[in-house]
From Swiss-Prot:
<dbReference type="GO" id="GO:0004364">
    <property type="term" value="F:glutathione transferase activity"/>
</dbReference>
<keyword id="KW-1133">Transmembrane helix</keyword>
<dbReference type="GO" id="GO:0071277">
    <property type="term" value="P:cellular response to calcium ion"/>
</dbReference>
<dbReference type="InterPro" id="IPR001129">
    <property type="entry name" value="Membr-assoc_MAPEG"/>
</dbReference>
<dbReference type="GO" id="GO:0005789">
    <property type="term" value="C:endoplasmic reticulum membrane"/>
</dbReference>
<feature type="topological domain" description="Cytoplasmic">
    <location>
        <begin position="103"/>
        <end position="107"/>
    </location>
</feature>
<feature type="topological domain" description="Cytoplasmic">
    <location>
        <begin position="31"/>
        <end position="52"/>
    </location>
</feature>
<comment type="similarity">
    <text>Belongs to the MAPEG family.</text>
</comment>
<dbReference type="GO" id="GO:0031965">
    <property type="term" value="C:nuclear membrane"/>
</dbReference>
<dbReference type="GO" id="GO:0019370">
    <property type="term" value="P:leukotriene biosynthetic process"/>
</dbReference>
<dbReference type="GO" id="GO:0070207">
    <property type="term" value="P:protein homotrimerization"/>
</dbReference>
<dbReference type="GO" id="GO:0004464">
    <property type="term" value="F:leukotriene-C4 synthase activity"/>
</dbReference>
<dbReference type="GO" id="GO:0050544">
    <property type="term" value="F:arachidonate binding"/>
</dbReference>
<feature type="transmembrane region" description="Helical">
    <location>
        <begin position="81"/>
        <end position="102"/>
    </location>
</feature>
<keyword id="KW-0256">Endoplasmic reticulum</keyword>
<dbReference type="Pfam" id="PF01124">
    <property type="entry name" value="MAPEG"/>
</dbReference>
<feature type="transmembrane region" description="Helical">
    <location>
        <begin position="9"/>
        <end position="30"/>
    </location>
</feature>
Length: 161
């Protein structure tokens, strides 16, 4: 691969690898809680603490393919930097959700809602990139610079709760 191609995806790859490490951390928590309760073997049933860790992990795993799809679509079709920033924010929010779920379930609600907003932002970036592609294809009009400016300007607003 040439440097330009790698430069167009390197931030997305970094966010993806960080998310893999986070998934490993979540899986380790499930395994640790299972072994704490059940000795050496892994079982899906156990104490309330294990049920919470297991459910929080499953909820994060269920949303993971959607996150990866919109992260890479937004980064490739629209703009890499705002997509990577939103991806990092999503990982922080997912961590907050996971830790919050281990305590009171109401503590996980802000992370869940914030995560949905970030997924929506990445989805809209992807749609804008696809829309721009078809504008170029059919009409020869390229709004890529405008879309990049808007997404770069809006992405810090994801920090507002």
């Amino acid at each position: 691969m040439d440097q330009e191609t790698v430069g167009n995806v390197v931030l997305l790859a970094i966010v993806t690898l960080i998310s893999v490490v986070q998934n490993g951390f979540f899986a380790h928590k499930v395994e640790h809680e299972s072994r704490t309760q059940n000795g050496r073997s892994f079982q899906r049933t156990g104490t309330l603490a294990f049920e919470r860790v297991y459910t929080a992990n499953q909820n994060c795993v269920d949303a993971y393919p959607t996150f990866l799809a919109v992260l890479w679509s937004a980064g490739l079709l629209c703009s890499q930097v705002p997509a990577a920033f939103a991806g990092l924010m999503y990982l922080l929010v997912r961590q907050k959700y996971f830790v919050g779920y281990l305590g009171e379930r109401t503590q996980s609600t802000p992370g869940y809602i914030f995560g949905k907003r970030i997924i929506l932002f990445l989805f809209l970036m992807s749609v804008a990139g696809i829309f721009n592609y078809y504008l170029i294809f059919f009409f020869g009009s390229d709004f890529e610079n405008y879309i990049k400016t808007v997404t770069t300007t809006i992405s810090p607003l994801l920090l507002i709760p």
